[in-house]
Amino acid sequence: MWSRIYFLLIYVFSLNVSGSAQSELPYKEIPSYPTNYTQSTVISRMIDGLGYRYYWATENWRALDLDFKPDTLARSTFETMEHIYGLSFMILNASKNQVNERRDPDQMTANDLRLATLYNLKSASAAMALVENLEELNILFEGSTGRKALPFWYVLNGPLADAIYHTGQIVSFRRTSGNPMNSKVNVFMGKTDL
């Protein structure tokens, strides 16, 4: 229920901000880099790098691409997108010191997942850029035994690294299914020559 309400709010926000055009989604290009290196701007930039890669990994797909899986035991591209969507919430929640709740992305289309994931990453990047002391941030979980807080370090080797890894899987899956990512994407520069 909350997942659908959250997505609706993100969608309405995106209509107001971008005129609902896919070309106006965040991360078509990576934002300009900050003028100062701080612990927070470096992590914000890592999130931006993920957002840029995810944008292009999920741009101009076909149904065949979404259904593709390299093995019967593997996740499909669509299922991988669902997983990245969940990871994007963990990154966003950690950037705001909010508790992670299990989210169920059922009933979401690939476009819904893409939109929500990109906006989660954009929001997390913006929040991270404002953090003055990373030691104050934790990745928080609430369960039947109570709340568990882990240091922010776990965001780096956990959901952030995992989301980058799985975005690479989507790129590989697309190549294997015959619809490679746009060859003009330059992940080093964060720009795309169209």
Each model region followed by its residue ranges:
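Bacterial Sec-dependent N-terminal signal peptides
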Residues: 1-26
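Alpha-helix boundary/capping residues
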Residues: 61, 84-87, 120, 131
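Short, contiguous alpha-helical
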Residues: 25, 44-45, 55, 65-103, ...
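Short N-terminal segments immediately surrounding and downstream of signal-peptide cleavage
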Residues: 23-42
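Surface-exposed helix-capping loop/turn segments at secondary-structure junctions
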Residues: 60-66, 128-137, 175-181
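Stable alpha-helical elements in mature extracytoplasmic
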Residues: 39, 43-46, 50, 54-57, ...
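Acidic/histidine-rich alpha-helical segments that form the ligand environment
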Residues: 109-165
